[in-house]
């Protein structure tokens, strides 16, 4: 699984938040404005990060006049799932790693896992 650097993650968080809010794909200017309060980044830096993320396969882009519009290829949850599966692949014993993971989560998270497993066994999508 490809990882994200700190700045790449920050940019992805802006795009994932826009996606969560139902907002269309973003230009580099949109991302620069969203980051203006938190980070003092040059617009060219944001453009470079967006281009790099597109080349790595994290973003899709389409022309909009002279600008590019970017959108995440995968949801935040999908990305985290890939990271978790990648980490699981690195273990020598997946079963033990899964048991250890389940022991380390909260009781509310255990309930979520139970519901997801029940939905899988009954072929119903989880709520």
Name these PLM-found stretches.
Residues 1-14, 18, 75:
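Short alpha-helical segments that sit at the start of domains
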Residues 7, 64-83:
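Short, cationic-aromatic polyanion-contact patches
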Residues 21-35:
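Short acidic, hydrophobic short linear motifs in intrinsically disordered regions
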Residues 47-51:
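Short, hydrophobic-biased segments on the C-terminal half of alpha helices
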Residues 57:
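Glycine-centered, phosphate/nucleic-acid-interacting loop/turn motifs that mediate DNA/RNA or nucleotide
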Residues 61:
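Short beta-strand "wing" residues that participate in macromolecule-binding interfaces
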Residues 82-123:
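Amphipathic alpha-helical dimerization/coiled-coil segments
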């Amino acid at each position: 699984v490809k990882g994200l650097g700190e700045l790449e993650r920050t940019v992805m968080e802006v795009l994932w938040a826009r996606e969560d809010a139902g907002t269309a794909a973003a230009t580099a200017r949109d991302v620069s404005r969203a980051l203006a309060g938190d980070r003092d980044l040059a617009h060219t830096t944001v453009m470079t990060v967006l281009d790099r993320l597109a080349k790595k396969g994290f973003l899709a882009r389409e022309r909009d006049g002279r600008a590019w519009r970017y959108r995440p290829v995968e949801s935040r949850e999908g990305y985290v799932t890939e990271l978790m599966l990648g980490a699981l692949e690195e273990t020598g014993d997946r079963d033990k790693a899964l048991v250890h993971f389940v022991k380390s989560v909260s009781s509310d998270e255990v309930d979520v896992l139970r519901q997801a497993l029940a939905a899988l066994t009954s072929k119903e999508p989880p709520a």
